[in-house]
Protein backbone atom coordinates (compact mmCIF):
# COMPACT_ATOMS: atom_id res chain seq x y z
CA UNK A 1 0.00 0.00 0.00
CA UNK A 2 1.28 3.41 -0.89
CA UNK A 3 1.64 5.60 2.17
CA UNK A 4 -0.22 8.87 2.46
CA UNK A 5 1.30 11.85 4.24
CA UNK A 6 -1.02 14.53 5.51
CA UNK A 7 0.98 17.47 6.78
CA UNK A 8 -0.36 20.44 8.70
CA UNK A 9 1.31 23.64 7.50
CA UNK A 10 2.09 24.53 11.10
CA UNK A 11 3.57 21.13 11.86
CA UNK A 12 7.19 22.18 12.04
CA UNK A 13 6.88 25.47 13.91
CA UNK A 14 10.07 25.98 15.91
CA UNK A 15 10.40 27.13 19.51
CA UNK A 16 10.81 30.89 19.91
CA UNK A 17 13.88 30.65 22.11
CA UNK A 18 16.77 32.11 20.15
CA UNK A 19 14.81 31.40 17.00
CA UNK A 20 15.75 34.51 15.02
CA UNK A 21 19.50 33.95 15.22
CA UNK A 22 19.23 30.17 14.96
CA UNK A 23 17.11 30.35 11.81
CA UNK A 24 19.86 32.33 10.06
CA UNK A 25 22.76 30.01 10.86
CA UNK A 26 24.11 27.59 8.28
CA UNK A 27 25.12 25.24 11.10
CA UNK A 28 21.71 25.27 12.77
CA UNK A 29 20.23 21.83 13.40
CA UNK A 30 16.79 23.39 12.94
CA UNK A 31 15.46 24.17 9.45
CA UNK A 32 16.96 27.38 8.03
CA UNK A 33 14.75 29.95 6.35
CA UNK A 34 12.31 28.25 3.97
CA UNK A 35 14.27 25.00 4.02
CA UNK A 36 11.82 22.10 4.27
CA UNK A 37 12.12 19.59 7.08
CA UNK A 38 10.63 16.98 4.78
CA UNK A 39 13.13 16.34 1.98
CA UNK A 40 11.85 13.46 -0.10
CA UNK A 41 14.75 13.44 -2.55
CA UNK A 42 17.28 12.68 0.20
CA UNK A 43 15.11 10.72 2.61
CA UNK A 44 15.45 6.90 2.60
CA UNK A 45 12.16 5.01 2.53
CA UNK A 46 13.23 1.73 4.12
CA UNK A 47 15.11 1.02 7.32
CA UNK A 48 17.97 -0.66 5.46
CA UNK A 49 18.66 2.61 3.65
CA UNK A 50 18.83 4.66 6.85
CA UNK A 51 22.47 5.46 7.59
CA UNK A 52 23.76 5.57 11.16
CA UNK A 53 22.22 4.69 14.54
CA UNK A 54 23.04 0.95 14.10
CA UNK A 55 21.79 -0.22 17.51
CA UNK A 56 18.54 1.71 17.17
CA UNK A 57 18.03 0.30 13.66
CA UNK A 58 18.48 -3.26 14.89
CA UNK A 59 16.02 -2.72 17.73
CA UNK A 60 13.46 -1.06 15.48
CA UNK A 61 13.80 -3.75 12.80
CA UNK A 62 13.06 -6.46 15.38
CA UNK A 63 10.14 -4.44 16.73
CA UNK A 64 8.58 -4.00 13.28
CA UNK A 65 9.21 -7.59 12.17
CA UNK A 66 7.43 -8.87 15.27
CA UNK A 67 4.44 -6.60 14.64
CA UNK A 68 4.19 -7.81 11.04
CA UNK A 69 4.29 -11.46 12.09
CA UNK A 70 1.62 -10.88 14.74
CA UNK A 71 -0.40 -8.96 12.13
CA UNK A 72 -1.24 -6.17 14.58
CA UNK A 73 -0.27 -2.49 14.69
CA UNK A 74 2.95 -2.05 16.69
CA UNK A 75 3.08 -0.38 20.09
CA UNK A 76 3.40 3.39 20.22
CA UNK A 77 6.90 4.72 19.50
CA UNK A 78 8.78 7.65 21.05
CA UNK A 79 11.77 9.07 19.16
CA UNK A 80 13.95 11.31 21.32
CA UNK A 81 17.09 13.24 20.52
CA UNK A 82 18.53 16.54 19.28
CA UNK A 83 17.07 18.16 16.14
CA UNK A 84 18.27 17.14 12.71
CA UNK A 85 19.19 13.52 13.45
CA UNK A 86 16.39 11.79 11.54
CA UNK A 87 13.37 11.43 13.83
CA UNK A 88 10.91 12.50 11.14
CA UNK A 89 12.64 10.26 8.60
CA UNK A 90 12.35 7.26 10.92
CA UNK A 91 8.65 7.93 11.43
CA UNK A 92 8.13 7.94 7.66
CA UNK A 93 10.17 4.74 7.35
CA UNK A 94 8.06 2.97 9.99
CA UNK A 95 4.86 3.75 8.07
CA UNK A 96 6.46 2.69 4.80
CA UNK A 97 7.80 -0.56 6.25
CA UNK A 98 4.34 -1.37 7.64
CA UNK A 99 2.69 -0.26 4.37
CA UNK A 100 0.18 1.95 6.17
CA UNK A 101 -0.80 5.62 5.82
CA UNK A 102 0.77 8.23 8.10
CA UNK A 103 -0.85 11.38 9.47
CA UNK A 104 1.57 14.17 10.39
CA UNK A 105 1.05 16.98 12.88
CA UNK A 106 2.91 18.64 15.76
CA UNK A 107 2.45 19.79 19.32
CA UNK A 108 2.35 23.51 18.44
CA UNK A 109 -0.20 22.88 15.66
CA UNK A 110 -2.68 21.39 18.13
CA UNK A 111 -4.12 24.38 19.98
CA UNK A 112 -7.04 22.64 21.70
CA UNK A 113 -8.02 19.13 22.75
CA UNK A 114 -10.73 19.26 20.10
CA UNK A 115 -8.09 19.58 17.37
CA UNK A 116 -6.54 16.31 18.47
CA UNK A 117 -9.92 14.62 18.93
CA UNK A 118 -10.77 15.49 15.33
CA UNK A 119 -7.55 13.89 14.08
CA UNK A 120 -7.92 10.77 16.23
CA UNK A 121 -11.54 10.18 15.24
CA UNK A 122 -10.59 10.21 11.55
CA UNK A 123 -7.77 7.63 11.78
CA UNK A 124 -8.14 4.34 9.95
CA UNK A 125 -7.20 0.96 11.39
CA UNK A 126 -3.43 0.51 11.52
CA UNK A 127 -2.70 4.12 10.57
CA UNK A 128 0.31 5.93 12.03
CA UNK A 129 -0.11 9.30 13.72
CA UNK A 130 3.18 11.19 13.87
CA UNK A 131 3.30 14.04 16.39
CA UNK A 132 6.45 16.14 16.11
CA UNK A 133 7.48 18.19 19.16
CA UNK A 134 5.06 16.13 21.21
CA UNK A 135 6.37 17.77 24.40
CA UNK A 136 4.61 20.97 23.33
CA UNK A 137 1.09 19.54 23.34
CA UNK A 138 -1.41 21.51 25.47
CA UNK A 139 -2.24 19.84 28.78
CA UNK A 140 -5.84 19.09 27.79
CA UNK A 141 -4.66 17.44 24.56
CA UNK A 142 -2.13 15.34 26.50
CA UNK A 143 -4.86 14.01 28.77
CA UNK A 144 -7.02 13.15 25.77
CA UNK A 145 -4.08 11.36 24.17
CA UNK A 146 -3.47 9.24 27.32
CA UNK A 147 -6.86 7.59 26.94
CA UNK A 148 -6.68 7.29 23.17
CA UNK A 149 -3.28 5.59 23.25
CA UNK A 150 -4.20 3.12 25.99
CA UNK A 151 -7.90 2.40 25.53
CA UNK A 152 -8.34 3.46 21.88
CA UNK A 153 -11.26 5.72 22.58
CA UNK A 154 -12.02 9.41 22.94
CA UNK A 155 -14.72 10.95 25.07
CA UNK A 156 -16.91 13.31 23.06
CA UNK A 157 -18.87 15.97 24.93
CA UNK A 158 -22.48 16.30 23.79
CA UNK A 159 -24.55 19.31 24.78
CA UNK A 160 -23.66 22.34 26.86
CA UNK A 161 -23.93 23.46 30.44
CA UNK A 162 -25.27 21.22 33.26
CA UNK A 163 -26.95 18.92 30.76
CA UNK A 164 -23.74 18.10 28.88
CA UNK A 165 -22.70 14.46 28.81
CA UNK A 166 -19.65 12.50 27.71
CA UNK A 167 -20.05 9.79 25.10
CA UNK A 168 -17.12 7.40 24.51
CA UNK A 169 -16.15 6.97 20.85
CA UNK A 170 -14.28 3.77 20.08
CA UNK A 171 -11.23 4.14 17.83
CA UNK A 172 -9.57 1.54 15.60
CA UNK A 173 -6.12 0.39 16.70
CA UNK A 174 -3.46 2.83 15.51
CA UNK A 175 0.16 3.69 16.32
CA UNK A 176 1.34 7.02 17.68
CA UNK A 177 4.91 8.03 16.88
CA UNK A 178 6.02 10.96 19.00
CA UNK A 179 9.20 12.94 18.36
CA UNK A 180 10.81 15.16 20.96
CA UNK A 181 14.01 17.07 21.51
CA UNK A 182 13.15 17.41 25.21
CA UNK A 183 12.11 14.06 26.60
CA UNK A 184 12.32 15.38 30.16
CA UNK A 185 9.42 17.74 29.45
CA UNK A 186 7.06 14.85 28.71
CA UNK A 187 4.74 14.00 31.63
CA UNK A 188 5.35 10.53 33.07
CA UNK A 189 1.84 9.29 32.17
CA UNK A 190 2.48 10.13 28.51
CA UNK A 191 5.94 8.54 28.45
CA UNK A 192 4.47 5.39 29.97
CA UNK A 193 2.12 4.94 26.98
CA UNK A 194 5.02 4.36 24.59
CA UNK A 195 5.99 0.72 24.22
CA UNK A 196 9.18 1.51 22.31
CA UNK A 197 11.49 4.45 23.06
CA UNK A 198 14.46 5.22 20.82
CA UNK A 199 17.21 7.73 21.57
CA UNK A 200 19.11 9.16 18.60
CA UNK A 201 22.74 10.16 19.07
CA UNK A 202 24.99 12.56 17.19
CA UNK A 203 26.76 10.95 14.24
CA UNK A 204 30.50 10.19 14.16
CA UNK A 205 32.40 11.51 11.14
CA UNK A 206 32.57 8.07 9.53
CA UNK A 207 28.78 7.67 9.42
CA UNK A 208 28.28 11.25 8.26
CA UNK A 209 30.69 10.58 5.39
CA UNK A 210 28.54 7.65 4.26
CA UNK A 211 25.43 9.80 4.48
CA UNK A 212 27.06 12.62 2.50
CA UNK A 213 28.22 10.19 -0.18
CA UNK A 214 24.69 8.83 -0.50
CA UNK A 215 23.18 12.33 -0.66
CA UNK A 216 25.76 13.47 -3.22
CA UNK A 217 24.81 10.55 -5.48
CA UNK A 218 21.12 11.48 -5.20
CA UNK A 219 21.87 15.14 -5.93
CA UNK A 220 24.22 14.30 -8.80
CA UNK A 221 27.37 15.69 -7.17
CA UNK A 222 30.71 14.00 -7.87
CA UNK A 223 32.83 14.14 -4.71
CA UNK A 224 36.52 13.33 -4.95
CA UNK A 225 38.36 11.45 -2.20
CA UNK A 226 38.44 13.45 1.01
CA UNK A 227 35.66 15.88 0.07
CA UNK A 228 33.00 14.03 2.07
CA UNK A 229 35.36 14.00 5.05
CA UNK A 230 35.75 17.79 4.90
CA UNK A 231 31.97 18.17 4.89
CA UNK A 232 31.52 15.70 7.74
CA UNK A 233 34.04 17.57 9.91
CA UNK A 234 31.94 20.73 9.63
CA UNK A 235 28.51 19.15 10.11
CA UNK A 236 28.37 18.99 13.92
CA UNK A 237 27.40 15.33 13.89
CA UNK A 238 24.03 16.23 12.36
CA UNK A 239 22.68 14.86 9.04
CA UNK A 240 20.46 17.89 8.41
CA UNK A 241 23.49 20.19 8.60
CA UNK A 242 25.53 17.83 6.42
CA UNK A 243 22.89 17.87 3.67
CA UNK A 244 22.54 21.65 3.90
CA UNK A 245 26.29 22.20 3.55
CA UNK A 246 26.39 19.71 0.69
CA UNK A 247 23.85 21.83 -1.19
CA UNK A 248 25.94 24.95 -0.69
CA UNK A 249 28.97 23.10 -2.02
CA UNK A 250 26.86 22.04 -4.99
CA UNK A 251 26.09 25.73 -5.61
CA UNK A 252 29.82 26.45 -5.56
CA UNK A 253 30.51 23.66 -8.03
CA UNK A 254 27.79 24.85 -10.42
CA UNK A 255 28.93 28.48 -10.38
CA UNK A 256 32.57 27.47 -10.93
CA UNK A 257 31.72 24.89 -13.64
CA UNK A 258 33.31 22.03 -11.69
CA UNK A 259 32.79 18.47 -12.87
CA UNK A 260 33.81 17.13 -9.47
CA UNK A 261 34.35 18.56 -6.00
CA UNK A 262 37.77 18.33 -4.35
CA UNK A 263 38.48 18.72 -0.62
CA UNK A 264 39.89 22.20 -1.31
CA UNK A 265 36.66 23.17 -3.04
CA UNK A 266 34.72 22.24 0.10
CA UNK A 267 37.07 24.35 2.21
CA UNK A 268 36.74 27.38 -0.07
CA UNK A 269 32.98 27.08 -0.45
CA UNK A 270 32.29 26.84 3.27
CA UNK A 271 34.89 29.47 4.17
CA UNK A 272 32.64 31.84 2.23
CA UNK A 273 29.98 31.13 4.86
CA UNK A 274 32.54 31.49 7.68
CA UNK A 275 32.30 27.84 8.71
CA UNK A 276 35.61 26.42 9.89
CA UNK A 277 36.99 22.90 10.21
CA UNK A 278 35.28 22.32 13.57
CA UNK A 279 31.88 23.47 12.32
CA UNK A 280 32.16 26.79 14.16
CA UNK A 281 30.58 29.81 12.52
CA UNK A 282 30.83 33.58 12.99
CA UNK A 283 28.86 33.64 16.25
CA UNK A 284 30.81 30.75 17.79
CA UNK A 285 34.15 32.35 16.98
CA UNK A 286 32.95 35.74 18.24
CA UNK A 287 31.99 34.21 21.59
CA UNK A 288 35.31 32.39 22.00
CA UNK A 289 37.32 35.45 20.94
CA UNK A 290 35.43 37.65 23.39
CA UNK A 291 36.22 35.30 26.28
CA UNK A 292 39.86 34.88 25.29
CA UNK A 293 40.81 38.40 24.22
CA UNK A 294 38.53 40.56 26.37
CA UNK A 295 38.36 38.45 29.52
CA UNK A 296 41.66 36.58 29.32
CA UNK A 297 39.93 33.23 29.01
CA UNK A 298 37.29 33.85 31.68
CA UNK A 299 35.37 33.38 33.79
CA UNK A 300 32.86 35.85 32.39
CA UNK A 301 29.16 36.25 33.11
CA UNK A 302 26.59 35.48 30.45
CA UNK A 303 25.23 39.04 30.23
CA UNK A 304 28.69 40.57 29.81
CA UNK A 305 29.58 37.98 27.18
CA UNK A 306 26.37 38.62 25.24
CA UNK A 307 26.98 42.38 25.32
CA UNK A 308 30.48 41.88 23.90
CA UNK A 309 29.21 39.92 20.88
CA UNK A 310 26.10 42.06 20.36
CA UNK A 311 23.58 39.29 20.95
CA UNK A 312 20.82 38.58 23.45
CA UNK A 313 21.89 36.53 26.47
CA UNK A 314 19.25 33.94 25.60
CA UNK A 315 20.66 33.57 22.09
CA UNK A 316 24.20 32.96 23.35
CA UNK A 317 23.02 30.50 25.98
CA UNK A 318 20.61 28.44 23.88
CA UNK A 319 21.93 28.78 20.34
CA UNK A 320 25.69 29.02 20.65
CA UNK A 321 26.86 27.50 23.92
CA UNK A 322 25.50 23.93 23.71
CA UNK A 323 27.78 22.96 20.82
CA UNK A 324 30.80 24.78 22.28
CA UNK A 325 30.33 22.95 25.58
CA UNK A 326 29.73 19.60 23.89
CA UNK A 327 32.90 19.90 21.83
CA UNK A 328 35.04 21.04 24.75
CA UNK A 329 35.63 24.67 23.72
CA UNK A 330 33.75 26.15 26.65
CA UNK A 331 33.04 25.33 30.27
CA UNK A 332 30.16 26.69 32.32
CA UNK A 333 31.18 27.32 35.93
CA UNK A 334 29.44 28.98 38.90
CA UNK A 335 31.68 32.02 38.28
CA UNK A 336 30.91 32.24 34.56
CA UNK A 337 32.01 30.95 31.16
CA UNK A 338 35.60 29.77 30.70
CA UNK A 339 37.41 29.09 27.42
CA UNK A 340 39.30 25.79 27.44
CA UNK A 341 42.81 25.21 26.15
CA UNK A 342 41.21 23.73 23.03
CA UNK A 343 39.52 27.09 22.38
CA UNK A 344 42.79 29.03 22.74
CA UNK A 345 44.54 26.63 20.38
CA UNK A 346 41.71 26.74 17.84
CA UNK A 347 41.92 30.54 17.76
CA UNK A 348 45.70 30.34 17.35
CA UNK A 349 46.30 32.36 20.53
CA UNK A 350 48.84 31.37 23.17
CA UNK A 351 47.51 31.93 26.72
CA UNK A 352 49.75 34.14 28.87
CA UNK A 353 50.71 33.37 32.47
CA UNK A 354 47.79 35.32 33.92
CA UNK A 355 45.20 33.44 31.86
CA UNK A 356 42.68 31.41 33.80
CA UNK A 357 43.93 27.84 34.06
CA UNK A 358 40.99 25.49 33.52
CA UNK A 359 43.13 22.59 34.71
CA UNK A 360 42.99 24.04 38.23
CA UNK A 361 39.20 23.91 38.29
CA UNK A 362 37.75 21.52 40.84
From Swiss-Prot:
Which residues does the annotation say bind Mg(2+)? Answer: 88
- Which residues are ATP-binding? 42-43, 84, 87-89, 150-152, 193, 203, 240
Example of a GO MF term: ATP binding
Q: Which GO terms describe its biological process?
A: DNA recombination; DNA repair
Which UniProt keywords are given for this protein, alphabetically ordered?
A: ATP-binding, Cytoplasm, DNA damage, DNA recombination, DNA repair, DNA-binding, Hydrolase, Nucleotide-binding
Which residue ranges does the record annotate as region Head domain (RuvB-H)?
Answer: 277-362
| Hydrolase recorded as keyword | yes
Record Pfam families: AAA_lid_4 (PF17864), RuvB_C (PF05491), RuvB_N (PF05496)
- Catalysed reactions, as listed in the record: ATP + H2O = ADP + phosphate + H(+)
Q: Where in the cell is it found?
A: Cytoplasm
* Keyword DNA repair listed: yes
- Positions contributing to DNA binding: 332, 337
Reported EC number(s) for this entry are 3.6.4.-
Region listing for Small ATPAse domain (RuvB-S), in residue ranges: 204-274
Question: Could you tell me which residues belong to the region Large ATPase domain (RuvB-L)?
Answer: 15-203
Region listing for Disordered, in residue ranges: 1-20
Q: What class of enzyme is it?
A: hydrolase
Q: Which GO terms describe its cellular component?
A: cytoplasm; Holliday junction resolvase complex
What is its quaternary makeup?
Answer: Homohexamer. Forms an RuvA(8)-RuvB(12)-Holliday junction (HJ) complex. HJ DNA is sandwiched between 2 RuvA tetramers; dsDNA enters through RuvA and exits via RuvB. An RuvB hexamer assembles on each DNA strand where it exits the tetramer. Each RuvB hexamer is contacted by two RuvA subunits (via domain III) on 2 adjacent RuvB subunits; this complex drives branch migration. In the full resolvosome a probable DNA-RuvA(4)-RuvB(12)-RuvC(2) complex forms which resolves the HJ.
Described function? The RuvA-RuvB-RuvC complex processes Holliday junction (HJ) DNA during genetic recombination and DNA repair, while the RuvA-RuvB complex plays an important role in the rescue of blocked DNA replication forks via replication fork reversal (RFR). RuvA specifically binds to HJ cruciform DNA, conferring on it an open structure. The RuvB hexamer acts as an ATP-dependent pump, pulling dsDNA into and through the RuvAB complex. RuvB forms 2 homohexamers on either side of HJ DNA bound by 1 or 2 RuvA tetramers; 4 subunits per hexamer contact DNA at a time.
Per the record, what about its domains?
A: Has 3 domains, the large (RuvB-L) and small ATPase (RuvB-S) domains and the C-terminal head (RuvB-H) domain. The head domain binds DNA, while the ATPase domains jointly bind ATP, ADP or are empty depending on the state of the subunit in the translocation cycle. During a single DNA translocation step the structure of each domain remains the same, but their relative positions change.
Family from the record: Belongs to the RuvB family.
Q: What protein name is recorded for this chain?
A: Holliday junction branch migration complex subunit RuvB
Organism of origin is Bifidobacterium adolescentis (strain ATCC 15703 / DSM 20083 / NCTC 11814 / E194a)
Amino acid sequence: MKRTIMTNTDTFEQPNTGANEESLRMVSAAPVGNEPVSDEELRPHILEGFIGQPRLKAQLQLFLDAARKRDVPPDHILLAGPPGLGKTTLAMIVANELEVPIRVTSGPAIQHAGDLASILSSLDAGEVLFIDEIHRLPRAAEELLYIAMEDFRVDVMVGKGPGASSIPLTLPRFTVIGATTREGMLPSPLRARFGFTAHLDFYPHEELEKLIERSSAVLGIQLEDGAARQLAMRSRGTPRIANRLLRRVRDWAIVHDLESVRPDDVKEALALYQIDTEGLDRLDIAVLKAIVTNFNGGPVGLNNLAAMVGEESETVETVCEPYLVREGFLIRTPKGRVATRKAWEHLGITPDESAYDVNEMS
